[in-house]
UniProtKB/Swiss-Prot annotation:
This is Deoxyribose-phosphate aldolase. It catalyses: 2-deoxy-D-ribose 5-phosphate = D-glyceraldehyde 3-phosphate + acetaldehyde. NCBIfam families: deoC. The keyword Lyase applies. The lineage of its organism: Bacteria, Pseudomonadati, Pseudomonadota, Gammaproteobacteria, Enterobacterales. The gene is deoC. It comes from Escherichia coli (strain K12). InterPro entries: Aldolase_TIM (IPR013785), DeoC (IPR011343), DeoC/FbaB/LacD_aldolase (IPR002915), DeoC_typeII (IPR023649). GO terms for molecular function: deoxyribose-phosphate aldolase activity; lyase activity. GO terms for cellular component: cytosol; membrane. Changing Y259F: 200-fold decrease in catalytic efficiency. Changing D102L: 2000-fold decrease in catalytic efficiency. It is an enzyme of class 4 (lyase). One of its GO terms (biological process) is deoxyribonucleotide catabolic process.
Amino acid sequence: MTDLKASSLRALKLMDLTTLNDDDTDEKVIALCHQAKTPVGNTAAICIYPRFIPIARKTLKEQGTPEIRIATVTNFPHGNDDIDIALAETRAAIAYGADEVDVVFPYRALMAGNEQVGFDLVKACKEACAAANVLLKVIIETGELKDEALIRKASEISIKAGADFIKTSTGKVAVNATPESARIMMEVIRDMGVEKTVGFKPAGGVRTAEDAQKYLAIADELFGADWADARHYRFGASSLLASLLKALGHGDGKSASSY
């Protein structure tokens, strides 16, 4: 197996196969569930809006892949600093049956100098998630923070407040995941000594098998080859799947989506 094939198989099994579009429908989510079951293995999860969780749960069960996890998004994509709303949305997502919640950190508040609201928001959402055995991923929106010190600070605050994963991006802004921001975030995980309990998720802009290989190489360099499993590493993507399957000898690499 070539290096690209090996990394592509790894990446496929770490994917949060995503559709977060305004025109999402039950039919599109059902199709996403079907795509998550591939000839070479299942993706780790799907990521969808909360209202589609029941139909996704039903579809995953019917197709014999109930182990594929269901992730959803809250405080999304705006990252406002209203803790009550973020918490209400997170509780609603849990009630719908989410296995994982990806909440957007109030990044604009941090840029304006307020570190406390981000900590409090993540902590409140973490308490709700922990009570229901739901994983919490925190999206810090690196492409808007831009500054390395801010990316580092948002990562640190999220981890201190209880994040199970830190995630680069919503996929809804001009600049999403980059290898540079990924390295900064994973270095924070390393420097805080939390690599056993905190994972990393690049999202948006990871589109090709070669892209995925680059991101996995950073993780392997920092933590060793065994760290990037589904509890510690995910790719938030949709079009990536077709590229991975093509690298693995399945399909033509074409995809209908651009996340």
